[in-house]
Amino acid sequence: MNQFQCCICGRNNSEINQAHRELMLCAQCGSNARFRGLMLGVMRYAFNEESKPLIKQSDRRSITAIGISDSEIYAWPLAAKLSYANTYYHTEPQLDICDLRSIDQYSNIDLIICSDVIEHTPLAPRKVLENMRRMLRPGGILILSAPTYHLPETIEWYPDAASLEVKDCGGRHEVRWSDTSGAKHVDFRPCFHGGPGSTLEMRLIAHQDLIQAGMDAGFEVETLEFSPEIGYVWPIVPEYPGIAAPMDGRVLVLRRPHETPVKGRGYPR
């Protein structure tokens, strides 16, 4: 691919750096290939318009949207177009997608964007997806990404963890954890995203497992296929040390179906 037009800011890019979901940076807004895939999903399924970039979309203030620690690269254009709030784990406006009390502060949402979060959650992906489904109105959309792999099954680094603590041992980090049987474990080589001691990787997710988790959580699920013309594309090749399976990482679009209400009870949560 020699060029692309950024679907966020509209910049035509011809000098393209390394093809990777975290690279292929737009020369104007700085978006990477993953961000552009997310916004393609938003424009296709929320705006129903993908022929023009995000910053030139018409205002859709009737659409309520939640970001889960979204990048400012696309958070500010979304805030300018939608009734959108970017939420955070550690600060306001706060949202913990593993905590029902936090989840239940939000309801009847049209659109949720959750990018590269679900590989870090203490709860398994299916449960987290069930929680996000609670937040959506019937017919609502979740735009989801994770660094998924063509593995036969998801690898959980801390299976059945009941407690977990990251310890800084003189510049070297280790994870001390106990499983539900009470057995204690130490991981001397944990993987962090964003630098040592930052965001702990809890699992390597198989792409098909994430699709199945979405369906098991009550969603209709679609893999958003690549669109090279907007810079949403990367090679699906092995890249994880010691893992031969290729990294996929394509964006998923999950729709909460329109359920038939139960008389006297309304829609199921």
Label each region the model flagged.
Residues 1-107, 229-238, 246-251, 257-269:
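Conserved N-terminal segment of class I S-adenosyl-L-methionine
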Residues 113:
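A conserved beta-strand element that flanks and buttresses the S-adenosyl-L-methionine
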Residues 116-120:
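Short catalytic micro-motifs in class I SAM-dependent methyltransferases
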Residues 4, 123-137, 141-268:
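S-adenosyl-L-methionine-dependent methyltransferase catalytic module, highlighting the catalytic core
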